């Protein structure tokens, strides 16, 4: 099982502003915050990977087509949760790449939305159930 993922970002304060309200919608809660790092853990003691954000010391820009992180996908319990996340990121001004929809090219059921965070990282909320 994956223990944690660390991601460098150019502006940790902006990351806290963006990810603070988003992560509870993805079933994550704050783990810790310092001057140089911000971390979230699976909510309510669930097992899963922790997510750490660090202040980048070099800004080379980000592209998901280059070697490195392509995107992060968060599994949520229901399709309604996918829709809730979609509404939140739209209201936060995120660029939505794909609104909530079925993805028949992936093993079903696969219902997801994709968007970009303020730093250009592609994120996904996905539900692997038929239930709303």
Each model region followed by its residue ranges:
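N-terminal beta-strand motif that seeds the catalytic metal site of vicinal oxygen chelate
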Residues: 1-16, 72, 129-132
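Short beta->alpha transition motifs characteristic of CBS
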Residues: 107, 114, 126-132
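Short glycine-/small-residue motifs
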Residues: 50, 122-125
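Vicinal oxygen chelate
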Residues: 9-14, 73-113, 118
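Core segments of cupin and vicinal oxygen chelate
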Residues: 8-52
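Long, continuous compositionally biased terminal/linker segments
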Residues: 41-77, 83-84, 91
């Amino acid at each position: 099982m994956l223990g944690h993922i660390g991601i460098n970002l150019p502006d940790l304060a902006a990351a806290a502003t963006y990810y603070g309200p988003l992560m509870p919608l993805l079933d994550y809660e704050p783990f810790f915050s310092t001057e140089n790092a911000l971390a979230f853990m699976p909510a309510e003691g669930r097992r899963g990977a922790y997510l750490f954000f660090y202040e980048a010391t070099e800004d080379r820009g980000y592209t998901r087509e280059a070697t490195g992180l392509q995107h992060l996908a968060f599994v949520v319990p229901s399709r309604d949760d996918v829709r809730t996340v979609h509404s939140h990121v739209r209201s936060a001004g995120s660029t939505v790449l794909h609104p909530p929809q079925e993805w028949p090219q992936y093993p079903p059921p696969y219902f997801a939305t994709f968007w970009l965070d303020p730093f250009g990282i592609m994120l996904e909320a996905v539900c692997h159930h038929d239930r709303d």
